[in-house]
Amino acid sequence: MDANLRKTLDELPAEPGCYLMKDRRGAVVYVGKASSLRSRVRSYFDASRGDDRAFVALLDELLGDVEVIVTRSEKEAVLLENELIKRHRPRFNIRLRDDKDFIVLRLDERHAFPRLEVRRAREPRRAGARYFGPYSSASSIRETLRVVNRHFQLRTCTDHVFEHRKRPCILYQIKRCPAPCVYDVPEAEYRQSVEDAIEFLEGRETELVERLHGRMDEAADALRFEDAARLRDQLQAVERSLEKQRVLMADRADRDVVGLYREGPDLVVQVLAMRAGKLQDSRSYPFHEQEFPDEETLSSFLSLYYEQNAAPEEILVPVEPAEVDALADVLSERRGRRVRLLTPQRGAKADLLEVAARNAEQGFRSWHEKDERREQALAALTRALHLARPPRWMECYDISTFQGALAVGSGVSFRDGEPDKACYRRYKVKGVAGQDDFAMLYEVVSRRLRRALGEGAFPDLLVIDGGKGQLNAALAAAKDLGVPTKPSPGNEGAPFVELVGLAKSRLVDAPALGTTRVIGRRGRGGGASRAASGAAALADAAEAQEHGFVSELARSPERVFLPGRKDPVVLRQNSAELFLLARLRDEAHRFAITFHRKLRRERNFQSVLEEISGIGEGRKRALLRHFGALRRVKEATLDEISQVDGFGPKQARAVFEFFHPPRREGAEGAAVVGPPSAAAAPPIETAAVAEAVSEEDIDAALAAEDEDAEGPAPVE
């Protein structure tokens, strides 16, 4: 062992804190925490133990230094470890990507007529609201909402629509909503539906089934057969749903069960989410190069995982995590109530841990199979594109603009075939006027490579969204900055980055692909074939079918352009390597167009606010910072607008009344009360059918949350 390292170990304090292990180049490779830094760090090098654990031999090979940070308590060390892992991204630490996948349903009981909203599990909890879930996918939450909307008939419209609607939507007519937005629905009656929905979502089936049975019999005895039929349908829906769920624990507690399976340095952590004693969800988290003990790995995982997800009252773990008491304190503080970390050795809870362990092993097998397929795809891509090395770190760049205005660029990053969103970048094009995609790409790629030169880290492959012209613009940027685009002979260690262009497939006439042409009026003039694409090609196809001609429209293949090569490479259709490249390109396009639309909304936001008197540039910016989108300003209450910096009662009222003009008195604007008769019922707004909570609503709600989450992505 190095003398300086030995001296550092001899001087370690016996106090709580964090330690940073560094390699011989000074890079942090592992971050840990301990109640006693001296005992924990020295335990890795205790020769008397005859320690043959893999990570001990690994430390002998690469460790260059150990830095320690003393904290006032073990709890503070847990929190600091999280921050250090995020900052340094050490090679041997657990790192969780921002998990947006968990979804919950929120019901705000403070509202007289509450509704169910789709929210992300990671967002702060609202006081006075109930949360149901988590759900891991839109499809699982969609089925739940379908049953609730059909049989418990809660409103689905936003608060803004609810407060300003004058006529009921079509959901009222199809008996999916009592229309409390328009009619004088008794709050007690609506509250009963809310309580039924809550019991259904919480899995309290015994109480719900008994009450529905009683109300159904009561309605039948009173000859209210329509009500009895509705209650019968509710009862059947509840019973069908409950048939799919099995109670695993009689205590009906909320708990997470954590399983762990390891083979060498690779491991999978499995989390089974149980709510009200039933299995709600199961998720696998695979990790490479986890050489350190399971106790430390599990402690880091739990701290990071429950930073993104709400902790239940009880967490079952296969081994006791390092600094378990401090970790439990941190999780309890985040939850606002006590969280217990248990390692049961026998009984029903130990059986649950065994189930989680088996799921972790199955997740490990599936992950390794997927890993092998990804390695095969990278190897095939390397061969097909004649790359100097497998493209483990790929980036793709795209431009989005509308007639040259608000031009932006995007850069997305994939590592080992998976998105690495921490490395995504957005670019505002600054030095190009008008519609010049080549110049815009030149600017964006130049800025990216300039940053790479400063950091000393280059991707293995840059993919440019476009054809030969776009690729040449990117190559020119690399050349002007002196960045090599192929390995230097005799200097294998020198950095370089390879570039390719990926051109989208196009809808073309079959002659372009060497087959029969489209025959229509446009193609009969002199028998000459023409290249058709987009709307023109579709028009030809429709015309040909109308006149009985055979249409041979086809799609050109995706083409990959390589530097110094005239003809593009055409990858095998439906191959894994083509799918990987197309997925990377499509993600760059999505990221670019999302940013472009955001800038357009901001511009529209500014132009709309121009019409409000007394709102200057400073207050416009304050509104935009506070609400983020014009839609949210429109939906905000007067009190919420008053909380924006720089807004007094006068300015807040001006903004609120601009979007919510006071309703005029009169027949048209008068409130409608009482159950409507067939003759007196207001017209149904059939266009409002979209207000039902459907797949599109869920996807839109989650897209809005994703857009908000991507907002902090660096803009260069």
From Swiss-Prot:
Task: Name the source's superkingdom.
Answer: Bacteria
**What is the protein's major site of localization?**
cytoplasm
Q: Which residues form the GIY-YIG domain?
A: 14-94
DNA repair as a keyword? yes
GO molecular function terms listed in the Swiss-Prot or TrEMBL record: DNA binding; excinuclease ABC activity
Give the GO terms filed under biological process for this record: nucleotide-excision repair; SOS response
UniProt keyword Iron-sulfur present: no
Please tell me one Gene Ontology term that the record gives under cellular component.
cytoplasm
Q: Which UniProt keywords apply?
A: Cytoplasm, DNA damage, DNA excision, DNA repair, Excision nuclease, SOS response
In this entry, which stretches build a coiled coil? none
Q: How does it assemble?
A: Interacts with UvrB in an incision complex.
Please identify the protein, giving its name as recorded. UvrABC system protein C
Name the species this protein comes from.
Anaeromyxobacter sp. (strain Fw109-5)
> Lineage of the native species?
Bacteria, Pseudomonadati, Myxococcota, Myxococcia, Myxococcales
Q: Which gene encodes it?
A: uvrC
